[in-house]
């Protein structure tokens, strides 16, 4: 009997778990996941899964989740930050097909689903990985194990490419606050609300059908401090203090939050998919600004594409680069552009922006052309 290909996955987040799920039933692979933290429920955090990622997740039974636990997004309402005057609305139903709708949910639900779908077919070790050398994973408990292939999926603060890569993490001139509010009556659980202001914007969306919502408030910031953790505790009072020119709806949302967290926003200017037999995926490979809600979606795409390659016995990083680089670069570029567009403060430029947004959203052909490149994606190896 031919020996199985051994795969070590560093990181038990979205990217690593999706990849493992696609290969869990294959008799050709033996997989272990290394995740230093226990899988316990963290504070609720909103996550958006656009159509391109939903299509992939359905292949591992996401469409069997109780639909009450997430919310289908039908449109994006775009408002002025200061007065809630409506600029336009984007009809997401242009891209929604049955069971392939754009959805928003609590990230904990997604992780729990991915873990349950593994059905204990893949071993998960709660050990901290210290280093990767010569295809060997070295853990803090002195455990060393060699693999044929290693998948690095340990997120934005990844340390396992090389020193130059570790130091390539850059901070964007923006600071984000986020929180979740429970039992909020917004009148709908099917919309994303986006508010555009001077050097700031605010995003609000449901994470289930029970009245729970996630918000993110992003401000231009020149702070150069880098936190060793992704987020730190804040408060609704602190956020209200820097949101004095927000409309009443935004202030009401912030006031309703019991827990608020803030974090600087990072990115990696270059993409690194790995070398030799060490593949890098998701935020570890191409951390991008979160201004197109594509971080999780691109991690899911990476995982699916790589798993499809492995199923066809293509264990080649050059091939992976050839099918992923241009798409990731395109979406990352759009995300950077959105930050500039959302935060315009010049009155004339804002008027031009609003006119263009109205045109894009009003005409289906233009909407489908502009957003279809992202949401209609279907990978063919």
Model-derived features: positions:
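Glycine-rich FAD pyrophosphate-binding loop
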Residues: 24-44
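Conserved FAD/dinucleotide-binding core of flavoprotein oxidoreductases
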Residues: 86-111, 182-261
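C-terminal helical "tail/cap" subdomain of flavin- and related membrane-associated enzymes
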Residues: 1-4, 8, 252, 292-293, ...
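Conserved Walker B
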Residues: 37, 156, 285
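Conserved N-terminal helical subregion
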Residues: 2-7, 24, 50-180, 224-237, ...
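Conserved Rossmann-like nucleotide-cofactor binding loop
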Residues: 15, 39, 157
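Conserved mid-domain beta->alpha element of the FAD-binding
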Residues: 9-24, 151-152, 177, 204, ...
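Residues at the starts of beta-strands that form the adenosine-phosphate
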Residues: 6, 29-32, 212
């Amino acid at each position: 009997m031919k020996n199985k290909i051994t795969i070590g996955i560093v990181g038990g987040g979205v990217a690593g778990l999706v990849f493992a799920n696609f290969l869990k039933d294959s008799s050709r692979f033996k997989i272990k996941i290394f995740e230093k933290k226990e899988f316990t429920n963290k504070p609720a955090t909103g996550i958006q899964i656009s159509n391109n990622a939903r299509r992939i997740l359905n292949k591992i039974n996401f469409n069997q989740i109780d639909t009450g636990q997430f919310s289908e997004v039908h449109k994006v309402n775009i408002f002025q930050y200061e007065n809630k005057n409506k600029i336009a609305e984007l009809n997401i139903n242009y891209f929604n097909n049955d069971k392939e709708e754009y959805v928003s949910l609590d990230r904990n639900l997604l992780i729990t689903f991915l873990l349950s779908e593994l059905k204990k077919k893949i071993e998960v070790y709660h050990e901290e990985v210290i280093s990767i050398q010569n295809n060997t994973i070295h853990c803090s408990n002195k455990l060393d194990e060699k693999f044929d292939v290693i998948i690095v999926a340990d997120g934005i603060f990844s340390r396992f490419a090389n020193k130059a890569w570790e130091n390539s993490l850059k901070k964007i001139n923006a600071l984000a606050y986020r929180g979740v509010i429970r039992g909020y009556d917004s009148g709908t659980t099917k919309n994303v609300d986006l508010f555009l202001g001077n050097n700031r914007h605010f995003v609000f969306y449901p994470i289930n059908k029970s009245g729970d919502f996630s918000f993110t408030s992003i401000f231009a910031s020149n702070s150069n401090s880098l936190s060793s953790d992704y987020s730190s505790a804040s408060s609704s009072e602190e956020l209200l203090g820097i949101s004095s020119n927000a409309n009443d709806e935004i202030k009401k949302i912030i006031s309703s939050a019991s827990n608020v967290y803030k974090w600087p926003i990072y990115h990696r200017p270059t993409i690194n998919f790995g070398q030799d037999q060490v593949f890098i995926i998701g935020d570890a490979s191409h951390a991008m600004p979160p201004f197109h809600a594509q971080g999780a979606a691109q991690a899911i795409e990476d995982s699916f594409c790589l798993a499809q390659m492995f199923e066809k016995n293509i264990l080649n990083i050059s091939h992976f680069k050839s099918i992923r680089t241009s798409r990731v670069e395109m979406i990352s570029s759009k995300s950077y552009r959105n930050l500039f567009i959302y935060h315009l403060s010049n009155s004339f430029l804002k008027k031009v922006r609003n006119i263009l947004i109205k045109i894009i959203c009003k005409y289906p052909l233009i909407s489908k052309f502009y957003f279809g490149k992202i949401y209609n994606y279907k990978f063919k190896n």
